[in-house]
Design a protein with these regions (language model features):
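UBC/E2-like fold recognition across ubiquitin and ubiquitin-like conjugation systems
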Residues: 1-35
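Ampiphathic alpha-helical segments that act as solvent-exposed interaction surfaces
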Residues: 5-17, 74-129
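Amphipathic, interaction-prone secondary-structure segments
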Residues: 22-83
């Protein structure tokens, strides 16, 4: 998996000022209908040993749902669950591992610190990169 490409995509996007478009990652102010609707990301990292990543944002009433999925072949799945599940829980990231795919989800509200969530996500996943 090419985690640095995913991290760069998210970092580049969140560092830009989108307030004129109705969404500001830095202050976490949402105009759900405008910005989140065009923030559906489906992308493929094309390399022999690369993984397929699927990530998207979906608007659900007064919050947004973030999901990212990718193949992750762990030799010690139990270590991931025991060591990292608490870290994810602290920032309300939920995960499941099924058929070689890791799925991570969270709910984003106006109070959500997106930078912190992504920092935690990437710091944990780098251990498996």
């Amino acid at each position: 998996m090419i985690l640095t490409d995913l991290e760069k995509l998210v970092t580049d996007y969140t560092n830009k000022d989108h307030s004129s478009q109705g969404f500001n990652f830095k202050s976490s102010e949402f105009d759900y209908e405008w910005e989140v609707s065009k923030l559906n990301w489906y992308f493929y990292l094309d390399r022999e040993d690369a993984s397929l990543f699927v990530a998207d944002f979906q608007t659900v009433r007064d919050y947004a749902y973030f999901r990212i999925e990718f193949p992750l072949y762990l030799y010690h799945e139990s270590e991931f669950c025991s060591e990292d599940s608490e870290i994810f829980k602290d920032v309300d990231l939920e995960f499941s591992f099924r058929n070689g795919w890791l799925k991570i989800t969270t709910i984003i509200t106006e109070e959500t610190d997106l930078h912190h969530i992504f920092d935690v996500l990437f710091s944990v996943l780098k251990d498996y990169n």
